[in-house]
Amino acid sequence: MAGNNKRNCEVYLFGETSTMESGHKTVKPKGIRPVYKTAGAAAADLAVPERVEIKPHETVKICLNIGFEIPKGYCVKLYPRSSLLVKRGLIQPVSIIDQDYSGQKVHAPLHNLTDSVVVLEAGERVCQAMLEPYFDVVDWDHEQNERDPAGFGGSGRV
């Protein structure tokens, strides 16, 4: 996920070869490298490596055949592309890939909201990946805070 002025994150592209009982070899397509489509893009687009059919109202977990080597103190978040719902009727929840999941295959969960089969062709972009820092939870003595615990307007009148 290298890009202009962006924190780097190594990407693995997986491909699989397996032999069936008949002796025929099958090859699972290699993952497609994430791409920043514009110079100002905050997230890299991720694509499906092979054709996928999603039945009406079905939820699927699509293996993208990629993995990330995530730096310490960071995680990768998968966000839906805005066109996924508007143009295809698919939703994808925000997903978090923890630093200690580095090197594992990434999957994108998708749900078909429509009454029709939705077909995603190989190479079709379905979500976006963003490398983000995360915070650690620490103990804090809230009694030392001078602000009013009421919330809005808690620091006093303007």
Please give the residue ranges for each predicted region:
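DUTPase catalytic domain/fold
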Residues: 1-158
